[in-house]
């Protein structure tokens, strides 16, 4: 799947789940389950409850996503 097909949205971490999964509330009010992207995992980027993040989602399943950036 090409990168252009992905939907990027801003959100806030609501809670931390097992296996580096997170529940994220998007700016439009929807709540999705997201995991950390490989580059963030490799560089040991820490994500805590309340952090602002950018989530990348596929148009095929809008209930799951990938966290690609943590805002300061």
Swiss-Prot record:
One of the essential components for the initiation of protein synthesis. Stabilizes the binding of IF-2 and IF-3 on the 30S subunit to which N-formylmethionyl-tRNA(fMet) subsequently binds. Helps modulate mRNA selection, yielding the 30S pre-initiation complex (PIC). Upon addition of the 50S ribosomal subunit IF-1, IF-2 and IF-3 are released leaving the mature 70S translation initiation complex. It is found in: Cytoplasm. Keywords: Cytoplasm, Initiation factor, Protein biosynthesis, RNA-binding, rRNA-binding. Component of the 30S ribosomal translation pre-initiation complex which assembles on the 30S ribosome in the order IF-2 and IF-3, IF-1 and N-formylmethionyl-tRNA(fMet); mRNA recruitment can occur at any time during PIC assembly. InterPro entries: NA-bd_OB-fold (IPR012340), RNA-binding_domain_S1_IF1 (IPR006196), S1_domain (IPR003029), TIF_IF1 (IPR004368). GO terms for cellular component: cytosol. SUPFAM superfamilies: Nucleic acid-binding proteins. Its main location: cytoplasm. Belongs to the IF-1 family. GO terms for molecular function: ribosome binding; rRNA binding; translation initiation factor activity. This is Translation initiation factor IF-1. Residues 2-72 form the S1-like domain. PANTHER family: TRANSLATION INITIATION FACTOR IF-1, CHLOROPLASTIC (PTHR33370:SF1). The keyword rRNA-binding applies.
């Amino acid at each position: 799947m090409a990168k252009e097909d992905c939907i990027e949205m801003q959100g806030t971490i609501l809670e931390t789940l097992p296996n580096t999964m997170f529940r994220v509330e998007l700016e439009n009010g929807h709540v999705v389950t997201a995991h950390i992207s490989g580059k963030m995992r490799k560089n040991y980027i820490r994500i805590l409850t309340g952090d602002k993040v950018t989530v990348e989602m596929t148009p095929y399943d809008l209930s799951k996503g990938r966290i690609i950036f943590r805002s300061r």
